[in-house]
Regions:
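N-terminal catalytic or cofactor-binding beta/alpha core of small enzyme domains
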Residues: 1-120, 127-139, 143-149
Length: 149
């Protein structure tokens, strides 16, 4: 069943499923689609690019999901994501905050944004999540499904 509540929400899942727990973002997106999140609103990325700002600027809301190395309470964290003019000296690591800043500067609007970070522990080449990452993913998915729309 299609989830109409998320019709104007974009989900940007960041990571690399070929590097174990770095695939947490993509696994979260897969679960969201299974729950009815519109597949055309799900974007899998190895990393964000400045070009993503155009698509993001037209959304009502955007959710960024990524793995992190930091041990977070409960294994994951959901936090507001605000625009920031801080850009690294590489296009390989453009942050969600920087993309939101570009949205505001170029397109004159910036959607409400949330960042979901999920703790992982294994980053070697290979597919599949560690047991710890899989548990943290389950916790994050549970919070996502119980969050009011």
């Amino acid at each position: 069943m299609r989830d109409r509540a998320h019709a104007d929400t974009l989900l940007f899942a960041l990571g690399n499923a070929g590097r174990q727990d770095d695939g947490l973002g993509w696994a979260f997106a897969e679960a969201a689609e299974a729950r009815g999140f519109p597949p055309e609103n799900i974007h899998l990325r190895y990393h964000l690019q400045v070009e993503d700002a155009e698509r993001i600027a037209s959304a009502g809301r955007v959710i960024f999901v990524d793995a992190c190395r930091e041990p977070l309470p409960g294994g994951f964290e959901v936090r507001p994501c605000e625009p920031s003019a801080s850009f690294p000296f590489t296009t390989h690591a453009v942050s969600p905050e920087a993309i939101l800043f570009v949205c505001g500067e170029i397109y004159g609007r910036c959607p409400e944004a949330t960042w979901v970070l999920i703790t992982g522990e294994s980053w070697d080449l290979g597919e599949g999540l560690s047991d710890t990452a899989a548990k943290n993913l389950d916790r994050a998915n549970s919070a996502f499904t119980s969050t009011p729309r």
